[in-house]
């Protein structure tokens, strides 16, 4: 039995083909482009509100009321401790930054309605993160380690630059700009350890001890001999002088004795006459 007209099998298949899947992304992109093209293109000094382009507010102001078909944008000044640095469509001004001393920061320029606070590093620190003239993070200047000296001192935007000590000099580290020369051991000292770029030469005083221990007894013996010779010479000189003076002493004694004898003889004669 033949099927009725119009009740036969369909001339097309209901199963999706590869071409159908390829059309889906194209349709999606087409709709997206239509939506983008439907939005108005605002100028640089305007901002988009719905389907309208509204004029931006000047630096130091914020949007109090957006524009409409019959009115423009209503702007208001930024309250204290807030600012806007550029033309904007912001409903609120931005809060002023705070320079935290615990982060090594100090206030370089106070905040205004059109400019944020400018922070710089306190002395002894340098800026690690710089945004124009504003610094957000500071680090302490590097201290040169032993064996190095300060070649260039740190500033508020640059760290300390260190350089190695040359041979014959040393540094204990720190903030000194010049390395110190090694100590030269004297003629009576011995070099125990040669200096390095971080330590000085070490000298020994044992040689001095040996020299003193040898010279001191010699000096004592020499002084004793010299004293003995001086005393002996003085004794000999005294003896020779005494011998030379003996005749004069005897003559003087005889001269003194004669008057005594004469006086005694005269007294005897007087006593005899009186008797």
Swiss-Prot record:
Cysteine disulfide links: 42-53, 54-67, 57-75, 78-93, 96-111, 99-119, 121-138, 144-162
Tissue expression pattern: Expressed at mucosal sites including colon and pulmonary epithelial cells. Expressed in naive T cells.
One Gene Ontology cellular component: external side of plasma membrane
GO MF: virus receptor activity
Residue stretches of each TNFR-Cys repeat: 41-75, 77-119, 120-162
InterPro entries for the chain: TNFR/NGFR_Cys_rich_reg, TNFR_14, TNFRSF14/UL144_N
Position of the signal peptide: 1-38
Glycosylation sites noted in the Swiss-Prot or TrEMBL record: 184, 197
Membrane topology: Single-pass type I membrane protein
Modifications made to the protein after synthesis: N-glycosylated.
Keyword terms: Adaptive immunity, Cell membrane, Disulfide bond, Glycoprotein, Host cell receptor for virus entry, Host-virus interaction, Immunity, Innate immunity, Membrane, Phosphoprotein, Receptor, Repeat, Signal, Transmembrane, Transmembrane helix
Keyword Glycoprotein: yes
Similarity annotation: Belongs to the tumor necrosis factor receptor superfamily.
Subunit (UniProt): Interacts with TRAF2, TRAF3 and TRAF5. Interacts (via CRD1/TNFR-Cys 1) with CD160; this interaction is direct. Interacts (via CRD1/TNFR-Cys 1) with BTLA; this interaction is direct.
Record remark on domains: The cysteine rich domain I (CRD1/TNFR-Cys 1) is required for interaction with CD160 and BTLA.
Protein name, UniProt field: Tumor necrosis factor receptor superfamily member 14
Gene for this chain: Tnfrsf14
């Amino acid at each position: 039995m033949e099927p009725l007209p119009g009740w036969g099998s369909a001339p097309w298949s209901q199963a999706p083909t590869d071409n159908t899947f390829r059309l889906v992304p194209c349709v999606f992109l087409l709709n997206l482009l239509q939506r983008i093209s439907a939005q108005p293109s605002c100028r640089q000094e305007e901002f988009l509100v719905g389907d309208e382009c509204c004029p931006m507010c000047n630096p130091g102001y914020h949007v109090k009321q957006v524009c409409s078909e019959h009115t423009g944008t209503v702007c208001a000044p930024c309250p204290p401790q807030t600012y806007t640095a550029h033309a904007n469509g912001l409903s609120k001004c931005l809060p002023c930054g705070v320079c935290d001393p615990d982060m090594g920061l100090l206030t370089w320029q106070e905040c205004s309605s059109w400019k944020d606070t400018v922070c710089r590093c306190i002395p002894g620190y340098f800026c690690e993160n710089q945004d124009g003239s504003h610094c957000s993070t500071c680090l302490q200047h590097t201290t040169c380690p032993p064996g190095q000296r300060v070649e260039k001192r740190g500033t508020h935007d640059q760290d300390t630059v260190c350089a190695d000590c040359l041979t014959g000099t040393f540094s204990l580290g720190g903030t000194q700009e010049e390395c110190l020369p090694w100590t030269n051991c004297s003629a009576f000292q011995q070099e125990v350890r040669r200096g390095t770029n971080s330590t000085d030469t070490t000298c020994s005083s044992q040689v001095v001890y040996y020299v003193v221990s040898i010279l001191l007894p010699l000096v004592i013996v020499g002084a004793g001999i010299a004293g003995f010779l001086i005393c002996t010479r003085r004794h000999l000189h005294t003896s020779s002088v005494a011998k030379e003076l003996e005749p004069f002493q005897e003559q003087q004694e005889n001269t003194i004795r004669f008057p005594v004898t004469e006086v005694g003889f005269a007294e005897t004669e007087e006593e005899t006459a009186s008797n």
